[in-house]
């Protein structure tokens, strides 16, 4: 009776000492906030393998190769497995723990001659902590949520990898076409230079005209060198993504950038369709993990009840070691609130961790919304830029022909023709870049929404 009164008193003291922050309301509000994004996202169909929309079997192969070979993604997979192992380890606390031991000993007196006394001992023990307050269950839940968050981290890495592969693939395609166009420009200026050289010999052109043509050739060659440097950097990026060494061939025949048909973006889908984003899911899961961990830590004020049982035996011979087993049982109660100063600050730390996770979640939501909104804007801008440049290029072609005719008629200087031709060639390169920007921006939309929405 006296012992029961002590246990009751301990429980009352524990309840009086809790005094923990009420984090349940803010956690529930965050869950409701996430639920609204889930409901909006469910209203639309999503195609998560958006790169297949380009109908490019080679691109599909390259993406698949990256998913298999990329080391960052492999490390993310290891992190997921580790989180799973940790969750399983924490879960082991919910089941009884077993251990056993055996030993043998020999004793004899050293002052007289006598035989040794030999004894053999064996024991089997089991212990179990009663989870009266669901503290252990909360700890297990926290570990499981952490594992789910790590799995979403891997999905984020996968999403980023795919986006990088697709954009780099089309960047190299653009640079290949830019180099080819620049080669045509160099030939164009070289032909003009040859004409000027011939006219100089004939005495119908001056040396300045020849120099101007050579100047245009050198400028075009420098542009080509710049494009080649960019292509080498892009190839390095793609090799890193595919985990290919310099001596290993890419084995890729890149398409012409202007022949790539864009998949488009459904701008009627609201920017709030973000629940499919793995980084948003990870932030929400980490919030749940921090909440469960804080609840478990708050319950560390409460008494802990441990049950134990053992079975042991001692004998002088191995054959009779189990003939006289002795059973024992134990009940232990620990009172952690007596160490109130340590428990108090551990609780405060866990609550601060929860608050950090809550702020991280809210920040991630805001970042995701702004990310989608900005990518929508960038896509529409890229489309408009491409359309304007294509129209401008038509005018530039007509202007170049105009000054070429005037020069041939002897009523205009070569410099005017070259300036017009340079503007035309620059706009041609700008169109290639603008087409790449359209592809890049639409892929940024797909990546920021974790798929193509219909």
From Swiss-Prot:
GO terms for biological process: transmembrane transport. Pfam families: OEP. GO terms for molecular function: efflux transmembrane transporter activity; transmembrane transporter activity. Disulfide bonds: none annotated. The lineage of its organism: Bacteria, Pseudomonadati, Pseudomonadota, Gammaproteobacteria, Pasteurellales. It comes from the Bacteria. Belongs to the outer membrane factor (OMF) (TC 1.B.17) family. GO terms for cellular component: membrane. This is Uncharacterized protein HI_1462. InterPro entries: OMF, OMP_efflux, RND_efflux_OM_lipoprot_NodT. Coiled coil: none annotated.
């Amino acid at each position: 009776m006296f012992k029961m009164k002590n246990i009751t008193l301990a429980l009352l003291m524990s309840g009086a000492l809790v005094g923990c922050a009420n984090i349940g309301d803010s956690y529930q509000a965050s869950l409701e906030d996430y639920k609204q994004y889930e409901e909006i996202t469910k209203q639309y169909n999503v195609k998560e393998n958006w790169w297949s929309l380009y109908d490019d079997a080679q691109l599909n192969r390259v993406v698949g190769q990256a998913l298999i070979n990329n080391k960052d993604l492999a490390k993310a997979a290891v992190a997921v497995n580790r989180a799973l192992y940790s969750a399983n380890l924490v879960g082991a606390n919910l089941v009884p723990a077993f251990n056993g031991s055996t030993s043998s000993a020999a004793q004899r007196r050293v002052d007289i001659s006598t035989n040794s006394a030999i004894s053999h001992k064996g024991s089997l023990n089991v212990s179990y902590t009663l989870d009266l307050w669901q503290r252990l269950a909360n700890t297990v839940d926290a570990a499981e949520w952490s594992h789910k968050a790590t799995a979403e981290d891997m999905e984020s890495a996968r999403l980023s990898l795919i986006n990088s592969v697709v954009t780099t693939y089309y960047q190299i395609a653009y640079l290949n076409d830019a180099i080819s166009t620049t080669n045509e420009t160099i030939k164009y200026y070289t032909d003009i230079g040859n004409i000027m050289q011939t006219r100089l010999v004939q005495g119908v052109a001056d040396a300045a005209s020849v120099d101007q043509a050579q100047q245009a050739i050198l400028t075009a060659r420098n542009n080509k060198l710049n494009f080649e440097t960019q292509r080498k950097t892009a190839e390095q990026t793609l090799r890193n993504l595919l985990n290919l060494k310099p001596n290993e061939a890419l084995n890729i025949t890149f398409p012409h950038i202007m022949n790539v048909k864009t998949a488009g973006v459904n701008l009627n889908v609201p920017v709030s369709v973000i629940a499919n984003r793995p980084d948003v899911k990870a932030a929400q899961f980490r919030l749940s993990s921090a909440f469960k961990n804080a609840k478990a830590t708050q319950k560390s004020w409460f008494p802990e009840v441990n049950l134990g049982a053992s079975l042991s035996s001692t004998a002088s011979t191995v054959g009779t070691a189990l003939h006289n087993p002795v059973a024992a049982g134990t009940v232990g109660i620990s009172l952690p609130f007596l160490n109130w100063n340590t428990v108090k600050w551990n609780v405060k730390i866990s609550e601060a961790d929860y608050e950090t996770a809550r702020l991280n979640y809210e920040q991630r939501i805001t970042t995701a919304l702004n990310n989608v909104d900005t990518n929508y804007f960038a896509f529409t801008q890229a489309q408009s830029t491409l359309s304007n440049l294509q129209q401008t290029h038509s005018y530039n072609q007509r202007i170049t022909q105009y000054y070429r005719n005037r020069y041939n008629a002897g009523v205009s200087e070569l410099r005017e023709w070259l300036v017009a031709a340079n503007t035309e060639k620059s706009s041609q390169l700008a169109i290639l870049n603008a087409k790449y920007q359209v592809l890049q921006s639409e892929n940024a939309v797909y990546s920021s929404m974790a798929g193509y929405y219909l």
